[in-house]
Amino acid sequence: MESLEQIKSRVEATVPGAKVEIVQNGSPSQQHSLLLDNEHAVAIARFLRVDPALCLDFCSNVTGIDWLDRTVKKSTKVKKLVDGQEKEIVETTEEKIPGYLEAVYHLYSITLKQGPVVIRMRTGDRAEGAPLPSLTPVWRSAEFQEREIFDLYGIRFDGHPDLRRILMWDEFEDHPMRKDYVQPDDFEWEPTPHDEVLARAKQHYTPRPQLDGAEKITATD
């Protein structure tokens, strides 16, 4: 199978205006990925599916990632005058990187028996309803998984045929897979009508009679 560098070059040469970045994965798996620019993501996805050398016709998994705002420290060596002498010292600066959300897709070719190729898209920020293009029109297996990411992370997939919650109820607020999500104090109080159900149950079932001391059954040899 082609390397990611080769795939990147062919995508940018074939899809007008497309920009692809290779994202390195430093974990033991070293499963590097391709970051697609959102404007051309659907066109790139169609190319990956129909290109004869790739034929990535199956999307096995789609997941969301929440990246919080973070501060990165950078160290650089500079020359400065210290006590009248020029010396090389290390200066540390801080760079604030705003948070964002990602959707990551794992692609395989069932026809050519090869893969995976991992692609990802990135929102501009972590705002409620941050948009990304839906890839469900290219891989139908992404439909429910994009709905799950919408439900749990809050990414709005433009072009999705049926974008609505899939695990949480419609009235649920917030997105429980976000890293800054705060769990409510009581899961049973709302929206489960616990008190109403308990009252109906007491009306339906007659209470069990209490046994006095003479009616208790005791074990015998």
Predicted regions and their residues:
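Terminal low-complexity/charged segments
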Residues: 1-221
